[in-house]
């Protein structure tokens, strides 16, 4: 699925409104993922504290949203722009790519609850397409 110019503009516009809250969004999304999808805890078993908002959760949420920020900046070529992250997740971290979709859903839930006026139906569709494209780009090295 490719992103239209309209989708790209909508994602960039939404990102410009939410990027100041990226760390909070990341923390809340990762916390939500671990609570709602407990099977994802297996990737973080080496952390001493998996409670929502813990130091490790916050740090990982910040990393995740840093990756989303990178993706927004590389929106015209996500496959090339996220190549290093794809390689890291495929070969070093060995994350099942199905988990990207789970985290994407959690990110959208958090954004929609934090920014209800900005999360219009159009923004929702464009962000969903964008995050799906990010998941696809991250899964590229698994093939």
Swiss-Prot record:
The lineage's top-level taxon is Eukaryota
GO cellular component terms given for this protein: blood microparticle; haptoglobin-hemoglobin complex; hemoglobin complex
Ranges for the Globin domain? 2-143
One GO term of the biological process aspect:
hydrogen peroxide catabolic process
Gene Ontology MF term list: haptoglobin binding; heme binding; iron ion binding; organic acid binding; oxygen binding; oxygen carrier activity; peroxidase activity
Enumerate the Pfam families for this protein.
Globin
Q: Which UniProt keywords apply?
A: Acetylation, Heme, Iron, Metal-binding, Oxygen transport, Transport
What is known about the tissue distribution of this protein? Answer: Red blood cells.
On this chain, the residues bearing N-acetylserine are: 2
Q: Which residues bind heme b?
A: 89
Q: Where does O2 bind?
A: 60
Key word Transport present: yes
Q: How does it assemble?
A: Heterotetramer of two alpha chains and two beta chains.
Please describe what this protein does: Involved in oxygen transport from gills to the various peripheral tissues.
Family that this chain belongs to? Belongs to the globin family.
What name does this protein carry? Hemoglobin subunit alpha
The protein's organism comes out as Pogonophryne scotti
């Amino acid at each position: 699925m490719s992103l239209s110019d309209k989708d790209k503009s909508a994602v960039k516009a939404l990102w410009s409104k939410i990027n100041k809250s990226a760390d909070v969004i990341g923390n809340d999304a990762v916390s939500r993922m671990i609570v709602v999808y407990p099977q994802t805890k297996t990737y973080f078993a080496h952390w001493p504290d998996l409670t929502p908002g813990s130091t490790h959760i916050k740090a990982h949420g910040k990393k995740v949203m840093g990756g989303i920020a990178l993706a927004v900046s590389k929106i015209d070529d996500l496959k090339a722009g996220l190549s290093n992250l794809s390689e890291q997740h495929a070969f070093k971290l060995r994350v099942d790519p199905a988990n990207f979709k789970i985290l994407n859903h959690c990110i959208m839930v958090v954004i929609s609850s934090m920014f209800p006026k900005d999360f219009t139906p159009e923004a929702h569709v464009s962000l969903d397409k964008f995050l799906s494209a990010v998941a696809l780009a991250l899964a590229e090295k698994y093939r």
